[in-house]
């Protein structure tokens, strides 16, 4: 028989047995769960090393996966080059939040039209023309010397390879960003002066203001597109600050005294812009040059501004449109310099009906690269 003390301790024994049994069960479950989890990690690791890797036994080199950033280059202690974003960097930097439609709608350029643009030069005829022309060339030479820019001979495309004059992607972006930051000044300053003149004299401006503001807006869109592709250095930003402050005030004062000289100066400035972008297009046509530009996507802001561009368009397609814009600015400003500044209308703004003579327009179908002569226009 079981003693009375055994009956008294029976609940304790049952509880102890239950705890031990539960612990054993938990241990088995724990062992099962641990074994399953370990096996799962092993299979995941194997799958990860197999995908996109020719050798499944070697781990993935995550550094080779493109991350948002810039294209690696040789950094010097005193680095003043513009860094070019890689494909992922352009997509990450392509902020389209609150992106509004362009205020000034861009003209539809045909493919044949953008390829017809070529380098031209209007020979200076008057003293003002010579001052404007040689002044432009002087500033161009100074800028070329500072930035290490040179155009090789047509028969020697690799003439400057390996020297400080060789144009890399970083140097091209530095040049484009600086030039566009300055090119947006004349149109806005001239439009502002003419706006004040219209208010002060209580008279119409005859459509000059709209075209000048459109020009400034267009140049700023060039700049906004380029800064989505390249990240300017502190040196470039500093030069832009100084250059804008000096150039804006000088241009403003000269435009008050003689606007004709200013428009001729801008016409020659745009000639140099067309020359620069033509050089860039020639290098893009060479498969051995600028390899990083060959595979770059264009920013979304460019697709929305130029109606003929798509997300599949190349960097060369973008530069062709920008060069065409500069060619049109060249034509407009040389034409403006040929007109009576405060009396004649803007011939680009309105097409005269019932006329069989060629007339200026904002497109590329009828152009005069050296400007329209006043005697050939309906004013």
From Swiss-Prot:
Biased composition (Low complexity): 33-50
Binding site for Fe cation: 180, 219, 222, 271, 326, 329
Signal sequence annotation: none
UniProt KW rRNA-binding keyword: no
Annotated binding of Fe cation 2, by residue: 219, 270, 326, 329
Pfam families, alphabetized: AOX
Record-level GO cellular component terms: mitochondrial inner membrane
Residues that bind Fe cation 1: 180, 219, 222, 326
GO biological process, one term: alternative respiration
Chief subcellular location: mitochondrion
Annotated region (Disordered), positions in chain: 33-76
TM region positions: 234-256
Compartments in which it is found: Mitochondrion inner membrane
Enzyme Commission (EC) number: 1.-.-.-
Domain of life, per lineage: Eukaryota
Topology relative to the membrane: Single-pass membrane protein
Note on cofactor: Binds 2 iron ions per subunit.
MF terms in GO: alternative oxidase activity; metal ion binding
Cofactors named for this entry: Fe cation
Record keywords: Electron transport, Iron, Membrane, Metal-binding, Mitochondrion, Mitochondrion inner membrane, Oxidoreductase, Respiratory chain, Transit peptide, Transmembrane, Transmembrane helix, Transport
The UniProt record lists the keyword Transmembrane helix: yes
Protein role: Catalyzes cyanide-resistant oxygen consumption. May increase respiration when the cytochrome respiratory pathway is restricted, or in response to low temperatures.
Family named by the database record: Belongs to the alternative oxidase family.
Name by which UniProt lists this protein: Alternative oxidase 1, mitochondrial
Upper taxonomic lineage: Eukaryota, Fungi, Dikarya, Ascomycota, Saccharomycotina
